[in-house]
C-alpha cells in the first residue's frame, strides 16, 4: 500500500518507545514531518536518527502548560497538525496493591493525556480534516493476574475512542484505535 502524507504534520506521543519509533518510521516513510512528544529523553536520539523532518520535544503530558508549549513549538517549526497518534503510557501497575496515587498517575498519563493532547490539537485537526489514532492494547480485553491499572486505562481509551469518533465526525476528524497484541514496547 502506498500512502502519501507528503507535507503533512503528525504528532506521536510516546514516540520514544519501540512501537513509537516504528510509528514514526512509517509516518516518515509516507512523507510526513513528525513531532515526537515524550518525557523520555531517548526520543531525541530517535528524532536524530532520521535525516530530516522529525523533531523531539521532551514533554510531560500530565502538564497542560507543557502540552500547550509543545503545540506552539510544533506550529513554529513544522506547521499545523493533520495526524495525532496517542501512544504515551505508563506501565505502573501493582494490581490490588496499587495506591490511589498510582491509580491517578496511571490514568493521568494513559487516559487524560490522550484527551488533553487531542483537545490541544483539535482546531488543527478540524481545519486539516485530520485523524487521531489512539493506542489501546489487548490488555483492554484480556484479564491479567496482578495487573489492574494498565488494563483498565486501556479499556477506557477504547471507549474514549468510540466517543471521540462520534463527537468529532461532524468536524471531519476521524478517530480510531489500534490494539496491539502482547509485545515489549521499550
Predicted segments — roles?
Residues 98, 143-151, 163:
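Active-site loop-to-helix junction immediately N-terminal to the catalytic Tyr of the SDR YXXXK motif
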Residues 137:
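Residue(s) in the substrate-gating loop at a strand-loop-helix junction
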Amino acid at each position: 500500500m502506498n500512502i502519501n502524507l507528503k507535507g503533512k504534520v503528525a504528532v506521536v506521543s510516546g514516540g520514544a518507545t519501540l512501537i513509537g519509533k516504528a510509528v514514526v518510521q512509517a509516518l516518515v516513510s509516507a512523507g510526513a514531518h513528525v513531532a515526537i512528544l515524550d518525557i523520555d529523553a531517548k526520543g531525541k536520539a530517535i528524532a536524530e536518527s532520521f535525516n530530516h523532518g522529525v523533531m523531539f520535544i521532551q514533554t510531560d503530558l500530565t502538564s497542560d502548560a507543557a502540552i500547550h508549549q509543545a503545540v506552539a513549538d510544533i506550529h513554529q517549526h513544522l506547521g499545523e497538525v493533520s495526524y495525532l497518534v496517542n501512544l504515551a503510557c505508563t506501565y505502573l501497575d501493582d494490581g490490588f496493591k496499587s495506591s490511589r496515587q498510582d491509580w491517578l498517575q496511571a490514568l493521568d498519563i494513559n487516559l487524560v493525556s490522550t484527551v488533553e493532547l487531542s483537545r490541544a490539537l483539535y482546531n488543527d485537526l478540524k481545519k486539516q480534516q485530520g485523524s487521531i489514532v489512539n493506542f489501546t492494547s489487548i490488555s483492554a480485553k484480556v484479564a491479567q493476574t496482578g495487573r489492574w491499572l494498565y488494563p483498565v486505562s486501556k479499556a477506557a481509551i477504547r471507549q474514549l475512542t468510540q466517543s471521540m469518533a462520534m463527537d468529532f465526525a461532524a468536524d471531519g476528524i476521524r478517530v480510531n484505535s489500534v490494539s496491539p497484541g502482547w509485545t515489549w514496547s521499550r
